Amino acid sequence: MTRSIVSLQVGQCGNQVGLKFWEGISAEHGIDVDGKYIGDRPDQELHRIGVYYNESSSGSYVPRAAMLDLEPGVLMAIKNSKRGQLFHPDNFAYGQSGAGNNWAKGHYTEGAELVETALDIIRREAETCDVLQGFQVTHSLGGGTGSGMGTLLVSKIREEYPDRMMCTYSVLPSPKVSDTVVEPYNCTLSIHQLIENADCVFAIDNEALYNICYNTLKIEQPSYDELNSLISSVMSGITCSLRFPGQLNADLRKLAVNLVPFPRLHFFAVGHAPLAASNSAGYRSLSVPELAGQMFDRNNMMAEIDPREGRYLTAAVYFRGKVSTKEVEDEMTLMQTKNSAYFVEWIPHNIKTSVCDIPAAGEKISSAFIGNTTAIEATFKRFGNQFRSMFRRKAFLHWYKSEGMDELEFSEAESNLADLVSEYQQYGEATADGVEGYEEEGYENDHPEDDEE
């Protein structure tokens, strides 16, 4: 039984990142722009194709995806692009007026009007799955649609499918790649929702993406397209274990069981290797130790954090290409032994490894990384401080109140974010004796029927 994932792309950023993701994984599965299979290794490429694609009666493979936005521009551009034929034409839903970078418009007014249409698409996709394992959402938290309507959809889906997994790829705003002054509001209100309604949040920081492009890839003025390509490469690496046969973390629930020690602490930093400027890429010998070193290097992480300022609760690493499983495991043991101060001692064996024979497009070997580190509190503190300095003066609040929002919701979001920061601090400093309830919490695997492939 194939256990499928339904994807939602919400807002401009979510749809542009989503399109890059589908381009990347279609190439890996041998699917052309019209959804036809043109690969040469069907036993590998098609074995679990049903996770992300639905096979139509004409034999083409259609992404299980809903494309959603509050204005038509980006979706029309996708529909008319060369990949436009890949998607189901009925799975595009858009409003006309946009959210104007206002979370309340996305969550309470404009977005609420479109949400029923969106849920119809999602139900229709869910019904075509043999077994639905869960949902993945790509969106940004800085604007109005991805943040406001994105989190509205997450909460509606949670109500309707309470026992399915909910994972989000959430792009956090940055002053270097900034669109709008109210980003701290939109971001904090969104995180407030994601703490309660998501199982796994891959936090991708525009600031870190910008720094990777500028410092490592030597791109003087990174475009959104280049930032999105970075996100799509890490999404492809993280999802390879879901899409190809015989892997650790072969579904979203197992991924969460391995990475989430306490239900609220489900915000992950992600990374990808190799990263090198195109003119120097040919000069490096890629080996497992080299990739491992790059993955754990703060300059390669897609979150603007310094892992040395916190401790890893858990981590998962995925190697792709012709690499030996034993070498990967030995390297990770060595990495953990050498850096034991940066891993909590009360979760033994907290780095999970996985090897996938099928390389990423254009790479001989590559790797992806997911880290649940307490250092991510720095990101939340950054938004919390920006939020506080505006909220104290009630700056721009009238834009939100005029859509029917209450100040109380702002205060609740602020205190939920502050609680999250202090929980990360508490577990970062805890010793083996000081942690209670670790065994009891986390995810019960109460869906044994899901484990059947």
Curated annotation (Swiss-Prot):
Cellular compartments per GO CC: cytoplasm; microtubule
Location of the region described as Disordered in the Swiss-Prot/TrEMBL record: 431-453
Subcellular location(s) per record: Cytoplasm, Cytoskeleton
Binding site for Mg(2+): E71
Acidic residues bias (residue ranges): 436-453
GO biological process terms on file: microtubule-based process
InterPro entries according to UniProt: Beta_tubulin (IPR002453), Tub_FtsZ_C (IPR008280), Tubulin (IPR000217), Tubulin/FtsZ-like_C (IPR037103), Tubulin/FtsZ_2-layer-sand-dom (IPR018316), Tubulin/FtsZ_GTPase_sf (IPR036525), Tubulin_C (IPR023123), Tubulin_CS (IPR017975)
Pfam family, one: Tubulin
Amino-acid positions noted as binding GTP in the UniProt annotation, renumbered to this chain: Q12, E71, S140, G144, T145, G146, N206, N228
An example molecular function term from Gene Ontology annotations: GTPase activity
Alphabetized UniProt keyword annotations: Cytoplasm, Cytoskeleton, GTP-binding, Magnesium, Metal-binding, Microtubule, Nucleotide-binding
Chief place where the protein resides: cytoplasm
Cofactor: Mg(2+)
The protein's assembly and partners: Dimer of alpha and beta chains. A typical microtubule is a hollow water-filled tube with an outer diameter of 25 nm and an inner diameter of 15 nM. Alpha-beta heterodimers associate head-to-tail to form protofilaments running lengthwise along the microtubule wall with the beta-tubulin subunit facing the microtubule plus end conferring a structural polarity. Microtubules usually have 13 protofilaments but different protofilament numbers can be found in some organisms and specialized cells.
Membership in a protein family: Belongs to the tubulin family.
Task of the protein: Tubulin is the major constituent of microtubules, a cylinder consisting of laterally associated linear protofilaments composed of alpha- and beta-tubulin heterodimers. Microtubules grow by the addition of GTP-tubulin dimers to the microtubule end, where a stabilizing cap forms. Below the cap, tubulin dimers are in GDP-bound state, owing to GTPase activity of alpha-tubulin.
Protein name per UniProt: Tubulin beta-1 chain
Encoding gene, per UniProt annotation: TUBB
